[in-house]
């Protein structure tokens, strides 16, 4: 049964890929590979949008889709498992027409609805956004501090972080405040993670003291 389900999902993705990529035959691979059904849909969409030079347009449209699906009335009907699939398909078809989305985005949304996979929509959008971020050379970085940073410190921090990037890469910085770390900061840039928080230092000191005494 599991193999049949996977086979079915593969056929759905191939169907979508064929519908949006035609008449282009060769798949354009995204700059990063994302696994799972969401990654497959996003890859097919990325390939088609890249071929048609509509990556940025599709990205904006998907962000709009994400906003619409969060609206209470829409979520109550579109994401409700008890609403008939045919009703969802009609509602989404009307929505994509009203928003004047490109055929690429419209085909994706309609196919997800027809295949009963609307719950995967946020994951597909997230996967596509990740592909676009890497496409632009963006390097995600999050910095967590115990208290807000002043402008001078933030500017200095950005300068230091940018010095670790390669040529052509763009820093995409997110600064968070978490009083529980007590002081210092926690930095995550790309796949690297550095914990310089006072909380962690105290925990290390505590463990060292227990080993001694």
From Swiss-Prot:
Location relative to the cell: Mitochondrion; Mitochondrion inner membrane
UniProt-listed Gene3D superfamilies: N-terminal domain of the delta subunit of the F1F0-ATP synthase (1.10.520.20)
Positions of modified residues (N6-acetyllysine): 54, 60, 70, 73, 100, 158, 162, 172, 176, 192
UniProt keyword list: Acetylation, ATP synthesis, Hydrogen ion transport, Ion transport, Membrane, Mitochondrion, Mitochondrion inner membrane, Transit peptide, Transport, Ubl conjugation
Keyword Transcription part of the UniProt annotation: no
Post-translational modification: Acetylation at Lys-162 decreases ATP production. Deacetylated by SIRT3.
Motif (SIFI-degron) on chain: 5-23
One cellular component (GO) term of this entry: mitochondrial inner membrane
Oligomeric and partner information: Component of the ATP synthase complex composed at least of ATP5F1A/subunit alpha, ATP5F1B/subunit beta, ATP5MC1/subunit c (homooctomer), MT-ATP6/subunit a, MT-ATP8/subunit 8, ATP5ME/subunit e, ATP5MF/subunit f, ATP5MG/subunit g, ATP5MK/subunit k, ATP5MJ/subunit j, ATP5F1C/subunit gamma, ATP5F1D/subunit delta, ATP5F1E/subunit epsilon, ATP5PF/subunit F6, ATP5PB/subunit b, ATP5PD/subunit d, ATP5PO/subunit OSCP.
Protein's name in the database: ATP synthase peripheral stalk subunit OSCP, mitochondrial
Protein source organism: Sus scrofa
């Amino acid at each position: 049964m599991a193999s049949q389900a996977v086979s079915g999902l593969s056929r759905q993705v191939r169907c979508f890929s064929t519908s949006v990529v035609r008449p282009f035959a060769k798949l354009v691979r995204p700059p990063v590979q994302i696994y799972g059904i969401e990654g497959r849909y996003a890859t097919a969409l990325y390939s088609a949008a890249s071929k048609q030079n509509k990556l940025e347009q599709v990205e904006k449209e998907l962000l709009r889709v994400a906003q619409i699906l969060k609206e209470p009335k829409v979520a109550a009907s579109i994401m409700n498992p008890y609403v008939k699939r045919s009703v969802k398909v009609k509602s989404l078809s009307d929505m994509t027409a009203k928003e004047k989305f490109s055929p690429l985005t419209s085909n994706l949304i309609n196919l997800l609805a027809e295949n009963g996979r609307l719950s995967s929509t946020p994951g597909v959008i997230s996967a596509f956004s990740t592909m676009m971020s890497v496409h632009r050379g963006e390097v995600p970085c999050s910095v967590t501090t115990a208290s807000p940073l002043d402008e001078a410190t933030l500017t200095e921090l950005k300068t230091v972080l940018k010095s670790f990037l390669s040529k052509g890469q763009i820093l995409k910085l997110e600064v968070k405040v978490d009083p529980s770390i007590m002081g210092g900061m926690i930095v995550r840039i790309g796949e690297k993670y550095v914990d310089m928080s006072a909380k962690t230092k105290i925990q290390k000191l505590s463990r060292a003291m227990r080993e001694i005494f």
